[in-house]
Amino acid sequence: MEKLMKRYALTRQGAKDFIICTIVTTIQNIMLMAPVAILYYITSDLISGSISKSNNVAYVIACVIMLVVMGVVFYFQYNTSFFSTYIESEHRRINLAEKLRELPLSFFEKKDLSDLTSTILGDCTVLEHNFSHVMPQFFGSIISTIIIAVSLFFFNCKLAVAALWVLPIALIIVGCSGKVQRGISRKKRKVVLAQEEGFQEYLETVKDLKSYNAEDTYVESLKEKMDNLEKESFRAELGTSVFVISASCILRLGIGTVALVGASLLVKGQIDIMTFFMFILVVSRIYEPMQGTLMNLAAIISQDVNVERMNEITNYPVQSGDGSLDVCLLYT
């Protein structure tokens, strides 16, 4: 719990809510496999010719129950995800403001106003978005994929390997890009701060600039900073997309390998048509949350810079004193 709090700048209650949200998201992802299971049994009855009116009623009831359960799970996941996230965001902003109030003046000498504003508003907003849309979905997808992957080995080991060999490779590609993406995020952050400082300085000194007829020159420097930010943003998006898209392309190879291996085993008589059909359905579904997981992993890696900036403030020693004020008057 302590590591989680320090790693993602969370309160203790926020860390507990995050764990609960991850568990609920895992259940949600597993529930999305329920339509695949019902479709499998319906297709099996159609192929075997054993479908009847009683079976039709049973399938209708199963579909209704599935929809109700999925609706409850989705509702609970939404509440645990967004309500807990915004409550934690409220506590984070208040605690950060209280911490700034207790810091010594030496800290503010090292920081620009735009830097502090960016930390309070920008970094908190990034963490707020990630913990409502990224983090629970990422860890929930990882856990649910592992559970589904283990269950596939009980049906056929060869097809399970053919379906899952791409997952660790795709995760390794994006995971190994962490150092590159953190470097890109830090460079972009410096450019963003330079632009914000430029606009802040312009607003504070606009009268002086006009009086010395230097406004046009300063505006040109601001335009140059904006161009630098545009270029750095392009590099940041390109650096992320290269790794994510490469991993996504490798992820799609799993469908082809399942089709090839499954067709070979089917011709040899080692599996039946329904086992092959089930793996095709599962593979087409299991890669969907993993596709989002790769994007989430890139966002999680890039948020490390935001967490570092917030931890720098929260871990800074506060100004201490006994509350008394000693005044010494000198008379000459």
Positions of the model-derived regions?
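Membrane-integrated ABC transporters
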Residues: 1-32, 47-59, 77-81, 85, ...
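Cytoplasmic juxtamembrane "membrane-exit" helices immediately C-terminal to transmembrane segments
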Residues: 79-87, 91, 154, 172-194, ...
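Primarily ABC-family ATPase nucleotide-binding module
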Residues: 314-330
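An intracellular "coupling" helix at the cytosolic face of ABC transporter transmembrane type-1 domains
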Residues: 9-16, 105-106, 122-131, 135, ...
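Cytosolic ends of transmembrane helices, especially the final helix of ABC transmembrane type-1 domains
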Residues: 214, 238, 286-313
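Transmembrane helices of ABC transporter permease
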Residues: 13, 17-28, 40-41, 51, ...
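Hydrophobic alpha-helical segments in the permease module
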Residues: 59-74, 167-171, 240-254, 260, ...
